[in-house]
Amino acid sequence: MIALTLAALALSASPQAAQDRAAPSQSAGSAAPAAETGATQAARQWLALVDAGNWQESWAATAQSFRSMNTVQAWQSASESARVPLGRMLSRIGRGEESIPAPPHGYQLVRFRTDFANRAGASETLSLAREGGSWRVTGYFIE
């Protein structure tokens, strides 16, 4: 299966990442269950912007490392090429979160199984880093 890579993966986070590990969570639709970590909740909130086709706001909500490597126009073009053909998001189930110990402090990977109108069972993976006290997306991948 060909991966639709929408952004480069930046490797920056804080030691907080290790504290926010969680067992895989499951959720129908896009509602976040109470047991989800801050990183998973931030990923869902960011994906809601992407689901709505709000490219400017979703770009602005990413980490500085993402924004420095991607212009709004490049993000919009890549998103429209990869996401729009999938159609409306129908359901998104959390498949887990993983701390990756990479320099300087690691990052969190959050995975979802997502059904879109034109493609069931897609795998979405987001990398997130702590920035300014919040989790911010540094990379987004669809397979």
State each model region's role.
Residues I2-L4, L11-A52:
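Short, low-complexity N-terminal intrinsically disordered segments enriched in polar/charged residues
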Residues L4-A7, F116:
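Serine/threonine-rich, low-complexity intrinsically disordered segments
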Residues P24-P33, Q73-S79, E124:
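Short charge-dense sequence patches
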Residues T40-A42, Q56-H105:
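Short solvent-exposed beta->alpha transition segments
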Residues G96-E143:
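Exposed beta-sheet edge and beta->alpha loop/turn motif
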